[in-house]
Amino acid sequence: MINKKSSNETRQKRHLRIRKHVIGTPDRPRLNVFRSNTAIYVQIINDETHNTLTSANTKELKVGANIEGAAALGKAVAEQALKLGITKVVFDRGGYLYHGRIKALADAARAAGLEF
């Protein structure tokens, strides 16, 4: 019998393929996104030192994990990054399609001043 892989397994494989090409540096750290059913988590990571420079999630902001919450999260993480002097990042969509909540987060981060 042929076993169908779950969508999360295929997303994880897609994310590994993306991570081969998306690398954060001290000049342009990586903006990583993880999306669950209940929350969205964002980290800005320097991959050379393996340090998380800043992070945010929808649970801390007390907003939902919907498109409006993703936009608020994008704005919040961009403000945190600008306080640290980070203006340019590399966007890592985490294997998710660039659509819906992921797109709303990215658009809000760009509007708040991050460049990617």
Swiss-Prot record:
One of its GO terms (cellular component) is ribonucleoprotein complex. This is one of the proteins that bind and probably mediate the attachment of the 5S RNA into the large ribosomal subunit, where it forms part of the central protuberance. Transmembrane segments: none annotated. Belongs to the universal ribosomal protein uL18 family. This is Large ribosomal subunit protein uL18. Coiled coil: none annotated. GO terms for molecular function: 5S rRNA binding; structural constituent of ribosome. Keywords: Ribonucleoprotein, Ribosomal protein, RNA-binding, rRNA-binding. NCBIfam families: L18_bact. The gene is rplR. Disulfide bonds: none annotated. It holds the Pfam family Ribosomal_L18p. PANTHER family: 39S RIBOSOMAL PROTEIN L18, MITOCHONDRIAL (PTHR12899), LARGE RIBOSOMAL SUBUNIT PROTEIN UL18M (PTHR12899:SF3). Part of the 50S ribosomal subunit; part of the 5S rRNA/L5/L18/L25 subcomplex. Contacts the 5S and 23S rRNAs. One of its GO terms (biological process) is translation.
